Amino acid sequence: MAARPSAKEVIELVDVEELRRAPIAILGGGAVGKTCGADCALAGQEVRICDLDPFFDNALGTVMRTGITLQDKAPGTQTKYGFRRMGKGEFAMATNSVAEAVKGAKLIVVGIPSIAHEIFFRELIPALEDGQIVHIIPDNYGSLKLRKMMREMGCTKKVIIGGWSSAPYGTRVDTEGGVAKPTCSLVYRAITLRGAALPAKDTEDFVESSKALGCFDAITEGDGAVCGDTVMDIGFSPM
């Protein structure tokens, strides 16, 4: 079977520049969500970040005042091609409402553990809008669950849904005395990731749209994102 093309080889399928100018919704206030959100903000994008109660206050209660600062994890962030972006990312919105976060957003990043997928998806599905692209990072079969729940809830919105084999970073929320600080330390930045969409016919559009995410810039400028065969293929990738 012929290999799928990498994102760099795909003819322009989605309007990357239009997507890059649109608001981005980040669902999840943990290390992946905070780092992806701050990275996109540092790339000049409008970012809204969301976590659900009862976690919102601890995770994001002060983020509108403090922002999230990205910094190296000693001895330094590993990155093959020298990509570097550090500093304080400022958010346009921090909310405990998924509907508020995703309204009018073109790109939605789901950066939460798979155990929380169902809880977030029940809030997300009624708020989906035609034309949105959902990136589940990492997928962990979240794309399958989201499509299944959309059918069960009668959602027929025309959206692209896919997931990635891993997060674009090794990252941790810094703590002091058991209290989370407004900083995330990066151990490494990925230079390539594999992604796929459900249905598979959307995969090339899905992978191409990653070029519009600031949190994928080290990948876009590295070896590029690659189309996986199916979301099952992506789900097995971290194992």
Annotated model-derived regions:
Residues A2-K80:
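NAD(P)+-binding Rossmann beta1-loop-alpha1 motif at the extreme N-terminus of oxidoreductases
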Residues R21, G44, A105, E129-G131, ...:
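A general structural motif
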Residues L60-V63, L146-E152, V207-A212:
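Short, aromatic/basic amphipathic alpha-helical patches
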Residues T62-K73, V109, G224-M239:
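Internal, conserved structured core segments that host functional sites
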Residues Y81-I137:
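Rossmann-like NAD(P)-binding element
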Residues S114-A180:
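Rossmann-like NAD(P)(H) cofactor-binding subdomain of soluble oxidoreductases
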Residues P168-M239:
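Substrate/ligand-engaging "lid" and interaction regions
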